[in-house]
Amino acid sequence: MAIRHVKRRYSESSESSSSDESVVDSTEISVDINDDDAVKPDNEESQLEGERDMATNDGMENNGCSDLSSDSEDSSSEESDEEPVFQRPIFIKRNQLAEVTDSNNQGNVLRRIEHENKVVEQNEEAKKQIATNYTTDKEILMKAMSLNDNDLIDPEGERLRWLERQKIRKEKYRKKLIDKQLELEEYEANKLLNRDIDKLEENTTTTTGEKDIPIKKSNRINNNKGDNEFKPKRVVNVTFKSLDDNETSAVANEDSEYSIL
């Protein structure tokens, strides 16, 4: 058994009589309540409160979803309607602007001066290199620069002068070949002469029967050191082949002592 004490306050009523002036401030009323009766209302109240909480949560979730959808729609519409954002301009005071322009002008002037100095130094170095390279060949360089290689002014005269130069070249080449041939013939003649002298010496030693007498070889011609390069031999089985057109042209183009004649 559970006992609850309930206190109640009674206010004075204007309708009460004067005889009932005594006021009861508080009265204690004892109520007997069974344990089962006390538990039931608590359970019912808790169930009601749980249902109310569920309903409020569902309402909040629905409201939140609707708010999110509306926010997303608003944000998409705002993004589509948004214009490109420009940076806010920065205004500089006149004094600061004048200082900045002065510093920029000074920096540009210094850069120009440095660039001009570098260009002057490079030109001087190039002149020095040219002077050192052509100090010994200045005359040749001047002659080469003064040559007139334009053939359009007098083509016939240029052709005649070219033919003259070609003729001089051929004569020089022919003279060179003749000198070489004469040198070879002289070598062969000296070799034959030395061979004859050796044979005469052998004959004199056999006929006398006496002791070998040394014979002066004053008549022998001293050969040069480069004579060993020439070793002529006798011709054996000489055959001449028929020359075709191609072979004749190749032989004609070949440089020899008779090619210029």
Swiss-Prot record:
One GO-annotated biological process of the protein: mRNA processing
GO molecular function: RNA binding
Ranges of Low complexity composition bias in the record: 13-32
Chain intervals with Acidic residues compositional bias: 70-84
Keyword vocabulary terms for this entry: mRNA processing, mRNA splicing, Nucleus, Ribonucleoprotein, RNA-binding, Spliceosome
Superkingdom as given in the UniProt entry: Eukaryota
Compositional bias per record (Basic and acidic residues), positions renumbered to this chain: 37-55
Locations listed in the record: Nucleus
GO cellular component: spliceosomal complex
Start and end residues of each stretch annotated as Disordered: 1-88, 205-229
Family of the protein in this entry: Belongs to the SPP381 family.
Quaternary data: Component of the 25S U4/U6.U5 tri-snRNP particle, a subcomplex of the spliceosome.
Task performed by this protein: Component of the spliceosome and rRNA processing machinery. In association with the spliceosomal U4/U6.U5 tri-snRNP particle, required for splicing of pre-mRNA.
Protein name (Swiss-Prot/TrEMBL): Pre-mRNA-splicing factor SPP381
